[in-house]
Amino acid sequence: DSNTSTITVTVTSVNDVPVAADKSVTTAEDTAVTVTMSATDVESDALTYSIVATPDNGSLGTVSGSDVVYTPNTNYNGSDTFTYKVTDANSGVSNIATVTMTITAVNDAPVTSNGTATTNEDTPVNIALTATDVDGDSLTYSVVTSPSSGSVSIDGSVATYTPSANTNGSDTFTFKVSDGTADSNTSTITVTVTSVNDVPVAA
């Protein structure tokens, strides 16, 4: 038999790129949330996170470490996505990972507006009340404070103001609306009642 020889094999290190993970995050409408992105690296290299594609229905703050703040667009609810990648200390670049955002709906209170109207003494006037609701809910109108020199009734979104007999000048009433869940602000309607000459009555 021959002598025994030794073969020395040198295995050179090859950088393994990090692996970025997909994420799912939920937040409420009009509520920002911090998203923590994640990745693994077998060599435990320091990792740098960067955004690849920004969301369509929200915005992202500046990436801080593995965190980024997602802010949904005003009154938006539904789904949104953005993507990110990770670079290790040896310039290895990960796959592109997707963050799927779910933005849950939150009821928005309706908003009313002040208004004005003019009518003649002893003459009722119809006034279209103004309110908006970003959720498109059905609205119910109601009087909050009645006028001091007349009366008011509401049918749908139309108020009928009737001045007291032989009164003139300025009068006000207030109203609000409800979407079935939330009440609006209270708005004021100012009514100007113009004087009308009353014919004399013979005794």
What is each PLM-predicted segment?
Residues 3-12, 24, 91-106, 116, ...:
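C-terminal edge beta-strand
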Residues 18-31, 52-56, 110-123, 144-148, ...:
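Short, solvent-exposed loop/edge segments of extracellular or virion-exposed proteins
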Residues 31-36, 77-83, 123-128, 168-174:
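Short, solvent-exposed loop/turn segments enriched in Ser/Thr/Gly
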Residues 71-77, 162-168:
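Short, surface-exposed loop/turn segments at beta-strand-coil junctions that are enriched for proline
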Residues 34-71, 103, 114, 124-162:
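Surface-exposed or secretory-pathway low-complexity segments enriched in glycine-proline
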Residues 15-19, 47, 58, 75, ...:
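Proline-centered linker/hinge motifs at extracellular inter-domain junctions
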Residues 86-88, 177-179:
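Conserved structural position at the C-terminal beta-strand
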